Structure formats: structure tokens, C-alpha cells
Design a protein with these regions (language model features):
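Short amphipathic alpha-helix used as the core "switch/output" element in two-component signaling
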Residues: 69-86
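Short, conserved "switch-loop" micro-motifs in signal-transduction and mechanochemical regulators
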Residues: 96-97
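Short acidic/polar segment at the start of the alpha1 helix of CheY-like receiver
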Residues: 15-19, 66, 101
Length: 133
């Protein structure tokens, strides 16, 4: 991937606290537009309906809460997002460090996989610096 300037980020996480913390952290980057979504369906719907432009980056929780019949599984949403906006990069966020899930997410199109923890913001900054500088 060619490094490009990060201009727009979508945050998809069922935790309002996580979304808020990520938004606060990413807001330190000048000129970055951030939109929050509490589930994968709302993010996909907004893109498909043309209500939002495709983002440069989507930060998405791997374990999204779902309702019965929902399509919010992180990998399913990842595959759909890569189908409808292939130029957008997706970084999966999760509270569980699991090499099998990490590899599966990357095989399905995720740019990277960051484990949520006290040091995850530094890891996230490192990934963003690597790909969007």
C-alpha cells in the first residue's frame, strides 16, 4: 500500500466509551474527519446510501454485539466493507490477542489487527504512522 495522508476515519464499535476514547485520541490529528458507528450495519448502510464518502480508514471492533439475525460479526462486516469500499483500509480492534483471528482478519482484507489495552493507543499510532504518513 502506498502511504497517503489520513483524512477520514470511521470508528465502528458497540462500546460508546471505546468510540469516545478513540475519537478523542484521533482528534489530535489536524484535518482528520471522524465518524462513529455503534454497529457494522449502520456503517455499511451510510456508505451504500451515499450519505457519507468512503473513508481512508475504518477502525472496527472484532467482537461487535449483535442482535438475532444481525450481520454484525466483525469478519462478516469486514468482508462487506472491503466489497463496497475496497480502497478503504480496515484495522481490526479487539480485546483478545489471538494469532488465529489476527491471521484470519488479515486474510479477509484487514490492514492490521490491534489489541485493545493500556498500550494500544501507541500501537495504533505506530500502525497509522506506518501506513498514513
Amino acid at each position: 500500500m502506498t502511504n497517503k495522508k489520513l483524512k477520514s476515519v470511521f470508528i465502528v464499535d458497540d462500546s460508546a466509551i471505546e468510540r469516545s476514547m478513540l475519537t478523542d485520541h484521533l482528534s489530535k490529528n489536524e484535518g482528520v474527519e471522524i465518524k462513529e458507528f455503534s454497529n457494522g450495519e449502520s456503517c455499511i448502510k451510510e456508505i451504500v446510501m451515499g450519505n457519507v464518502e468512503e473513508p481512508d480508514l475504518i477502525l472496527m471492533d472484532y467482537f461487535l454485539e449483535t442482535s438475532p439475525g444481525s450481520q454484525s460479526d466483525g469478519l462478516e462486516v469486514l468482508m462487506k466493507l472491503k466489497e463496497i469500499c475496497p480502497a478503504s483500509e480496515v484495522i481490526m480492534l479487539t480485546s483478545v490477542s489471538n494469532d488465529k483471528i489476527k491471521e484470519l482478519a488479515k486474510n479477509k482484507g484487514a490492514l492490521d489487527y490491534v489489541v485493545k489495552s493500556q498500550i494500544s493507543y501507541q500501537q495504533l499510532d505506530d500502525v497509522l504512522q506506518k501506513h498514513f504518513s
